[in-house]
A protein has these predicted regions:
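Non-catalytic DNA-binding core/recognition domains of DNA-processing enzymes
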Residues: 1-13, 143-144, 180, 184
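Flexible interdomain linker/hinge and immediately adjacent N-terminus
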Residues: 3-63, 170
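Basic, Lys/Arg- and aromatic-enriched nucleic-acid-binding interface segment
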Residues: 42-90
């Protein structure tokens, strides 16, 4: 209706102005003031990893670990992994599997699930379950950082379900994307 045209134009101009402001901010790759308040520095993450490392040393030789103690091992692994391989929540429901077992899987399973593939020539992270998989295909990441591999081995040696890389330590079920987000906050 013609009587609404001026209001509609004003709204569209304001919308376009705000969209441009948002685009300009995104182009700078700088966090907003609000984001900066919630930002955690790499130094702070490394300090937390050091604290968790000291805690894991205290539990060495324990026959049975409580869920709280298991979380220390898993949290340490997650932080170390994500510092070297920033893959957001792509570790959700990731199975740990040998290369031979992976090669024997049907193609569809390889392309729709996530795996940590052990064995020669190197450990590999295969990501087949992620939002833009149809566009980019399965991502494969070679895991060759010695600190990450040591943390992974340590975590899997105490994990209640070493068939999955991240689990709910109380029941051994694989972690979902939501569980990972909750664990990191």
């Amino acid at each position: 209706r013609p009587e609404y045209e001026p209001a509609l134009r004003k709204y569209q101009e304001r919308r376009d102005e705000l969209n441009q402001k948002y685009t300009d901010q995104q182009q700078t790759k700088q966090p907003s003031e609000k984001q900066s308040k919630n930002w955690v520095s790499v130094t702070e993450i490394n300090q937390l990893i050091d604290e968790l490392t000291l805690e894991t040393k205290q539990y060495k030789g324990y026959a049975k670990l409580s869920p709280k103690e298991l979380n220390v091992f898993q949290d340490r692994f997650m932080l170390i992994f994500w510092l070297s391989y920033p893959v957001r929540n792509d570790l959700h429901t990731t199975r740990v599997i040998t290369r031979r077992a992976f090669n024997a899987l049907p193609r569809e399973q390889k392309e729709t699930q996530n795996f940590i593939i052990g064995g020669k020539p190197a450990i590999e992270f295969s990501i087949g379950n992620y939002k833009t998989r149809k566009k980019y295909g399965v991502k494969k990441i070679r895991v060759d950082d010695k600190v990450v591999l040591a943390a992974m081995r340590q975590w899997l040696s105490v994990s209640p379900n070493p068939d999955y890389i991240l689990v709910n330590v109380k029941n051994g079920e694989p972690m979902s994307s939501l569980n990972i987000t909750q664990a990191l906050t």
